[in-house]
């Protein structure tokens, strides 16, 4: 899915009031490492997670990383996929994923506000294909529509029976079709 890296996009996933409203049960698991932290008072999940993920306490680091990865893995597909979460439950994978993502998010993805949208004119003449799941809870489809509106040479494929994960059958099918289409154009 398309992720624009704006504060509201990060907040949708990692702060209360966005995806947490759809997955309240998984959200409770995501919040567990934050009990007795600044996040309880401030509501700043990402900043508090960043402190835990970079802290000296190894047990807290891994607990936070696993909760972060479990949250993301749990909301990535339209229908639950038990084996999708296998990688997410590995402590080292979870720590790498959580630290990288969290580092970007506390630094506003190293973007100026709306930087991607403001610069779409630079690539709007280039062909492209966006494949986005209709029920993507990590990157809501609104972001794909915003990019598509500014990218004249781009096709937008909204997959009706998919969430965020590239392993979902509809996403896989559309990615293969897009790859074949470009292979034919470039041949």
Regions found by a protein language model. Give the residues of each.
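Hydrophobic, aromatic-rich cap/lid helix
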Residues: 73, 92-113
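Accessory cap/linker subdomain of secreted extracellular hydrolases
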Residues: 47-85
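Conserved alpha/beta-hydrolase "acid-adjacent" motif
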Residues: 112, 137-143
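Catalytic active-site module of serine/aspartate enzymes centered on a nucleophile-bearing elbow/loop
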Residues: 154-187
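A catalytic-pocket lid/entrance helix-loop region that shapes and gates access to the active site
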Residues: 1-48
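Short beta-strand/loop motif that positions the catalytic acidic residue
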Residues: 123-124, 130-132, 136
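Active-site nucleophile elbow and catalytic-triad environment of alpha/beta-hydrolase enzymes
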Residues: 5, 9, 103-120
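Active-site-adjacent alpha-helix of alpha/beta-hydrolase-fold enzymes
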Residues: 68, 141-154
